[in-house]
Regions:
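Non-catalytic cap/lid and distal C-terminal segments of serine-dependent acyl enzymes
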Residues: 2-263
Length: 263
């Protein structure tokens, strides 16, 4: 596996007036997964002062569709989530904790890996047993579930919900933006209908624009019926008029970040 580091002082190339990537990033190329039987790329975005205090540990946010998160040059349609800018802005304003962000690149199996399928189960196992294990061993993380979140949009939002729901002992926070809750004939809702155990200790961020309006509202209502409390267990947001793309998710990224990691 090759590792490429991009430090703050080397990242001043601009893309249409804005800096491509802000902060310290380590790119991990072609990490072999025994579980998936393929090589995967991911990046680890580190807090600005990560190297200044060797004793400090940080919460971690795992995100899907890694190529779309911090660099418009690698992102779909040339627009990224601006995760690096938003986290930096909020931490500099002392509104949220410093965190580590791990962005897992997708591949041709994205649809199946992000769903409740055999490949989806393998992807979840890869995240926990291989990727998270590697990140926790190499970086100064707060590895417990209370300091570990997962987030994505569209199918990545569905994946985040499923991963946290099935593994609350690992992920206690799930950011589900414009999620594809409709996928596979509303299977995720059938799963919730069949659940009769005590409420799982997970914080959910649920949002949508005009896309997914009915399913997003349905998920919020269903979780509320199951005992999840708005403002404590759930943050719900309807972005009126918003389309289904990276630019829109970038505009409201501060909401889940503050809900999960706000001071």
């Amino acid at each position: 596996m090759a590792i490429f580091r991009r430090k703050r002082k080397f990242n001043k190339k601009k893309n249409k007036g804005r800096i491509s990537v802000i902060g310290n990033v380590e790119y991990h190329k072609e990490m072999y997964s025994r579980i998936l039987n393929c090589k995967r790329d991911f990046f680890v975005w580190l807090p600005a002062k990560y190297e200044e205090d060797a004793s400090k540990r940080y919460p971690v946010l795992y995100m899907h569709d890694g190529q779309n998160l911090i660099d418009p040059k690698t992102s779909f349609a040339g627009k990224d989530w601006q995760v690096d800018e938003t986290v930096t802005k909020l931490t500099n304003a002392f509104k949220m904790k410093e965190i580590i962000v791990v962005g897992i690149y997708n591949n041709n199996d994205r649809l199946e890996e992000y769903s409740d399928s055999v490949k989806g189960e393998r992807y979840r196992k890869f995240l926990i047993e291989e990727l998270k294990a590697f990140v926790d061993s190499r970086y100064r993380t707060l590895a417990d579930n209370k300091n570990t979140a997962i987030m994505g949009s569209s199918m990545g939002g569905l994946a985040s919900f499923l991963i946290a729901w099935n593994h609350p002992e690992v992920f206690s926070m799930a950011g589900c933006m414009s999620s594809s809750f409709y996928y596979n004939d509303d299977k995720v809702f059938k799963m919730l209908e069949e659940y009769s155990e005590p409420k799982k200790q997970i914080k959910f961020y649920i949002d949508h624009g005009e896309d997914g309006l009915l399913r997003g509202q349905k998920m919020f209502c269903k979780l509320s019926q199951m005992g999840y409390i708005i403002g404590t267990d759930i943050d719900y947001f309807y972005a009126r008029g918003a389309e289904h793309n990276e630019s829109e998710w970038a505009k409201r990224l501060d909401r889940p970040l503050l809900f999960f990691f706000g001071k």
